[in-house]
């Protein structure tokens, strides 16, 4: 690192540079050629410097391993020319390279510090980037400056070679300075008070980007010996692949000795047994150190799944894990990674995507024939996700912390999943008149994990896929897609295109001909089902406990369930019904006499007349999310679970949740009590839901007392308020996996997405009563000179003086709440400028809605003013009332941009979130029209 001026000024600027990475021996790196001898002496200092007055110590340089030699063909200067946004697996990969993503963070100062920041003099705020692996933020122009302060990212691999004779078997911390830090200091247990240092350039914490331990940036909390001590890799050490396992290999040289070896016949025989993938040279090799306590994890993310969820979730995994165990499936698929990690003992896989992504990974594992096959867990993205629902992972990802997901993967149970072969060949008995030019002789997949179906559902799916391929621009909205599905299903129903399905098929299951039974039933759809879930969570097999002819459905019993659907049973399926159970079998021979739409795990096609054989292929090893109690906080004086729990139920609106879910205390204050339920001490959330809904139906319950304010919608869900640093939603499909005692202690919180913000606050004046029920006593200030002013000016003065009682009195007397002054400012503008929350709430409830987007002479709405003044609560009120977040003032700024200029990043992030929500809502409304 470049030495600093020993003066106090020099130390101050050094604290701003904030380079706090721990390193290996810097002496191994050798002196830099442009350094003077005096500086070389200073570099041999044991690596400690004080930050200002009794600030924490730091050591510069690379991380826990000896600095690697420059990669041949990749000089140091060239590596910085290109900003890296993905993990580099080439032989020219840079040691300790950052992985940059775009960010809209504006409050955090540039990590390189003012001394090295080249963007500080620019007139406008320069674009910034954030490293996903160590979470530092720098200006794009300042990325090269990180070399000057010698700060690299946490290392993801180590170098191999004869120089590193004593290769390290442990990982050292990667210390990073933070100007903001959540949680508490590991040494003293006190918080970091980031609320008071938000606009400060002072370093408040030093944290490790591996284990996430954080300390106050002062010598009383962060000791010198902690720089060199081994890192535990944190609470997820069992799933993190240490960088010591990953070696960069040297490309073999064409020496004389090597050429002689190539001529040996035995060598030729050995190499001929290897496939082309296994035999070729790779820049990186894996040398694991097996441990029975470790469950190393590979994460595969499909960024195309779930809108933008996949791309965002990658960044979270890069932070919690080694970046070289996280893979983007759009960059080449899973095969390369599975080949490389095939010898890692006790390996587990996390597939982030839809059921199609899971099937892709399972098929690749089949091709590689890994022994034993690693179990696969699922993080469901998007919609549908029937396999994920079956294995208790839920129907989609909401906002569960990634840290908790990793714990679920580590602790999940290993189960088996039947996989079924599909073999189709043309039906030679079909006549030429049955041929269809648009049909194909091949199925889209030759194996299925979920289901194989033909008839009505396949026809609807096929039309959707064909229309989307022809006009992809018309299918970029989930709402539009659902509308198209509904329209196609309705038109297909009217046309009756699948009503004669039974006349053109023959079904033989385990040697028994079911064709007569099917012809009597006249189904419009037949499903061969492997798992209990189908069509986004429905259960078509149901619970045949009363029917002794059928067994309950399992995904590992080697049997398929054959189900027929009439239009009546298809409609009943969406409200808890089931289809017509035909049989359970191990083998199916299906013959079609004409071209019929079919689908394999959601992939449709129109299959020409064929003979199809379905038989068990193998069993895949999967991870099933377990029901556990270990997430509950443990205390030394913890009491056993009582027989009964008496719990207060409180409801949170979606507006409050999105604005405050990172602030537990404020969100608790914003919640509305619904009542009290008494549940068994060991009850899960599924049972608790039944008690809460019973509370709504009781004559003396909360729903009966105030139906407008307290009646729950059908889409409410539980909130976990205990196991993470913030609130997060619990998927309804996973309620049976969580105990009440895990997510609540004395009070349980639920989120109602259809609850309006105003109804969540009973202390606000209700819109249904235009005037207050009880008169107010005028304040002394309101009594002076009131009669001397016109009514409009009286209203303005009342708004300025925060005199809500006077405002109500004038309104009752016929005052116009839309009155403006000479500069076109409304009463709401004046109330915002003085920070009068009570007046703002009254105006929002009683003034016409046009007041929300009314502009004054500078083009500013009341929301522009509130954002510029950093009035978060008032902004929250105005946004809840329905103000537009996309209106711009005369300078072209939206309210979010005004908050950014005021350097209030939390408010700007909230406004940006609500702005995106408004845009999506507007798009869906336009589509509905």
From Swiss-Prot:
UniProt entry tagged with the keyword ATP-binding: yes
Positions of the UniProt region annotated as Mediates interaction with RASGRP1: 279-417
Entry's free-text remark on domains: The PDZ-binding motif mediates interaction with PDZ domain-containing proteins like SNTG1 and SNX27.
Protein name (database record): Diacylglycerol kinase zeta
Zinc fingers (Phorbol-ester/DAG-type), renumbered ranges: 98-153, 173-231
Species: Mus musculus (Mouse)
Motif (PDZ-binding): 925-929
Region (Disordered) location: 1-46, 59-81, 257-281, 421-441, 760-785
